[in-house]
C-alpha cells in the first residue's frame, strides 16, 4: 500500500476527516498528524511538531498533500491572525525545503488559500481589530478595486 501524507488546512472534519475517509478503499494509506498538534479555530497548530511529523513520514511516503497555511502559520484561521516574524515563517519553509531535497522522490502537492476580506464587523476568525473595523476595511478594498476596474460613481468617490 502506498503512503499518502496529509497535512490539512485545519481540524474541521471536511478537511481532516473526509479526505482520510475518501481514501479508505483506495491503494493509499493516508496518514495525518494527531489532532492534538493541529489548529483549533484561532489557536495555531504546533508548527514544530507538524514539521517533525512530516520529517518522520516523508521517508516512506509516495506523496504529500499539504496546506502551506498549516505548515507556515499553524492553520487557516491562524494564518489570518498570526504574529510570527518573517524570519520564523521563512525558517519553517526552509525546513520543509530541506525535507524536499532529502526526499526528492516524494511528490508534493502544496496548496494555500488567498486571504479573504470579510465584510462583517466580526473577529471570530479574523484579527481582533476586525470587530470595529471589518466592514470599513472591506469597503475600502472594494472601492479601490472598483475604481481601478470600472470607476466610481460620484457618491462612492465622495
Enumerate the language-model features and the residues they cover:
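An N-terminal assembly and electron-transfer interface module characteristic of large anaerobic redox
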Residues: 1-158
Amino acid at each position: 500500500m502506498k503512503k499518502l501524507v496529509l497535512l490539512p488546512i485545519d481540524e474541521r472534519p471536511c478537511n481532516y476527516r473526509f479526505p482520510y475517509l475518501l481514501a479508505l478503499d483506495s491503494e493509499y494509506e493516508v496518514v495525518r498528524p494527531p489532532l492534538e498538534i493541529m489548529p483549533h479555530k484561532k489557536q495555531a497548530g504546533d508548527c514544530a511538531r507538524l514539521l517533525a511529523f512530516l520529517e518522520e513520514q516523508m521517508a516512506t511516503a509516495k506523496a504529500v498533500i499539504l496546506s502551506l497555511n498549516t505548515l507556515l502559520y499553524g492553520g487557516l484561521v491562524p494564518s489570518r491572525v498570526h504574529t510570527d516574524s518573517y524570519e520564523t515563517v521563512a525558517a519553517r519553509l526552509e525546513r520543509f525545503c530541506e525535507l524536499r531535497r532529502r526526499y526528492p522522490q516524494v511528490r508534493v502537492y502544496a496548496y494555500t488559500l488567498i486571504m479573504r476580506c470579510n465584510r462583517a464587523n466580526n473577529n471570530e476568525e479574523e484579527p481582533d481589530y476586525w470587530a470595529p473595523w471589518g466592514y470599513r476595511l472591506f469597503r475600502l478594498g472594494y472601492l479601490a478595486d472598483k475604481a481601478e476596474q470600472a470607476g466610481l460613481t460620484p457618491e462612492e468617490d465622495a
